[in-house]
Amino acid sequence: MLIIFKDLNLVKTNNCQIIGWWKQLSLPQKTFLSFIPLFLVTSAFVLTGIVESLLTFGTIIEQIDKFTDQTNVMLLIYAVIYTFNPKSWLLKNQQFFLSALAYILFTFIGYNLILSIAGIAYKSTNPYKLTSSIFLHVIAPIAFFIASFIKIKHEKDVNINMFFKSLLLFMIYPLIYGLYLVTIPYVRHYLFNGRPSTYTIYGSITNTKNNPFAWLVVFAVLFIYFPLSYLAIYLLQLKLIKKAIQPQFNLPFTLNKWKQK
């Protein structure tokens, strides 16, 4: 009986600690925490796709090289770090947050607009794959947008990198991914109905080997869409936290000095 009472006291103590921890969380943290189960589901879809790719093709590249899957896993990573360790160096100067927001925005727009126009989006009639696609391309991105808006509205006293530095850091991932995107058709092939075919990530729209128009698409996305979309998100953050815009766009010291001459 004594052991039972000790166990009950331990449970009560743990419950009190959990309640205390929950109360000290900010509203944005609570919002991201509430979405972690959703991001776990989308990451499970990604993991299932990797296993399926391994069993079907004997490799996992057909799954892990998808921008959608990479950015959805990024949402889970960010939500976990922000909720449980908001002072982490990974979250310094809002760089991870703004970048993740811009990346998942492209996942949302790229799939539901660009790939839909190209006739690639939502083609599967398999209920599981269709459900997975909706979660990855619609539900999870919208959830992150909601949580992000709440975070920006409620966290006014934040440090943000100067725009050009922030943009440079943001562009590292798209540029690396873009380089992979345009080169993979030249180096990887697979058999389709017994015939060798060019491997592309998103069909003809990214087939830089056989479709010259694909180069224009990739160039436009990398050097026009990504910088402009990041600029829009960056300005939105500044506006919502009522931070002066002009100082954030000052050129680096060396460029300013050269400009004055």
UniProtKB/Swiss-Prot annotation:
What are the TM regions of this chain, as residue ranges?
31-51, 71-91, 101-121, 130-150, 167-187, 213-233
Q: Identify the InterPro entries for this entry.
A: DUF1600 (IPR011631)
Specify the protein's topology with respect to the membrane. Answer: Multi-pass membrane protein
Name of this chain's protein: Uncharacterized protein MG452
CC per GO annotation: plasma membrane
Task: Indicate where this protein is primarily found.
Answer: membrane
State the signal peptide span.
Answer: none
The source organism is Mycoplasma genitalium (strain ATCC 33530 / DSM 19775 / NCTC 10195 / G37) (Mycoplasmoides genitalium)
Source superkingdom: Bacteria
Keyword Cell membrane among UniProt keywords: yes
Give the UniProt keywords, A-Z: Cell membrane, Membrane, Transmembrane, Transmembrane helix
**Compartments it resides in:** Cell membrane
